[in-house]
């Protein structure tokens, strides 16, 4: 049995994950501390160092929203943590202006996020995976939480906190038909694209036939990278839709990502929320930037001109079966138009199938009796029953109640400000949690 080490500090807030959402929160808390006093805050992240979608940062990838929607500018344009100041500090501001774009490459935005995160080294711990979160009871009430994590050395650490913010991001969505192939290095999710592609024979120039499952931005980016970076690869795009569909990023539609739209969504009844989410679904899901669609179409057009059919575009196609064989991954493909079933064998399969956001429920399972249906308030605080005195916040898990921007970068600064305000209002100079922790250490 692993020996757990308990720390003596009682934290005011522990954050699970230190991605963009919690970095934005760290900034907001730092600003608020100047007027209201600093809190004892710690963020835990399972990655060994800071990386934002590090395994998907191919050279062609560009940010899909304006750089002005960084970690802070929407609420405090003069912040030293703005993207503009990052460019200034790295002596690239004039060069970036000369690019004439609102959309930096994701590699640069990742470096920006890493740069901001480096200012909060004392408040962050990398290489620590949060295993579980347990209630600490006093007289039948939850006065604090016990956060158990495991570091890279396998050591378990136990910390106490008066409040919690859960923001671990999404987990790869693996279609049912591929789940039996878990662990097979020839089948991998797009979130692990670079790591797995480096291990494939095509990285040394050997021929490969690769399937890309999905019809969204990730699938399109994977296809272009395979076409441009791996001349020995034959890539098949396999998607259920009849075509690659463009993202609607027109100005009026883009207002769905404005902070004020969160109030509109949250104030509506459940049925109306669902209707609005469906109406604007094509702003973010299963859609592709228009310029990328045009590039892909150009690839297939040039194939027709040359008469050399290197790649295939298989729309209206469903994967009914996936089988691992010595020769490769065998896919049974159903053409929705003709009903015909065909079998193709691939050397590798890339699952560009999106993400699920249920990890917060798994982490908070020991608190289930206090959380009810996991309803989230306007301030992103989970609605607990009266026995739970701890404030628990969730970032990136409330699209159904707060709108499509909840999982995106669009509202990070404003959301961080709202959570920090709610947190300071909740935390009062009481000693119940600290006394409870001292009792736990002594027992």
UniProtKB/Swiss-Prot annotation:
Its cofactor is FAD. GO terms for cellular component: cytoplasm; plasma membrane. Pathway: Siderophore biosynthesis; pyoverdin biosynthesis. InterPro entries: FAD/NAD-bd_sf, Lys/Orn_oxygenase. GO terms for biological process: intracellular iron ion homeostasis; pyoverdine biosynthetic process. It holds the Pfam family Lys_Orn_oxgnase. Optimum pH is 8.0-8.5. The keyword Transport does not apply. Keywords: Cell inner membrane, Cell membrane, FAD, Flavoprotein, Membrane, Monooxygenase, NADP, Oxidoreductase. Substrate binds at residues 69, 254-257, 284, 410. It is a peripheral membrane protein. Belongs to the lysine N(6)-hydroxylase/L-ornithine N(5)-oxygenase family. Homotetramer. Catalyzes the conversion of L-ornithine to N(5)-hydroxyornithine, the first step in the biosynthesis of all hydroxamate-containing siderophores, such as pyoverdin. Pyoverdin is a hydroxamate siderophore composed of a 6,7-dihydroxyquinoline-containing fluorescent chromophore joined to the N-terminus of a partly cyclic octapeptide (D-Ser-L-Arg-D-Ser-L-N(5)-OH-Orn-L-Lys-L-N(5)-OH-Orn-L-Thr-L-Thr in strain PAO1). Specific for NADPH, which plays a role in stabilization of the C4a-hydroperoxyflavin intermediate. This is L-ornithine N(5)-monooxygenase. It comes from Pseudomonas aeruginosa (strain ATCC 15692 / DSM 22644 / CIP 104116 / JCM 14847 / LMG 12228 / 1C / PRS 101 / PAO1).
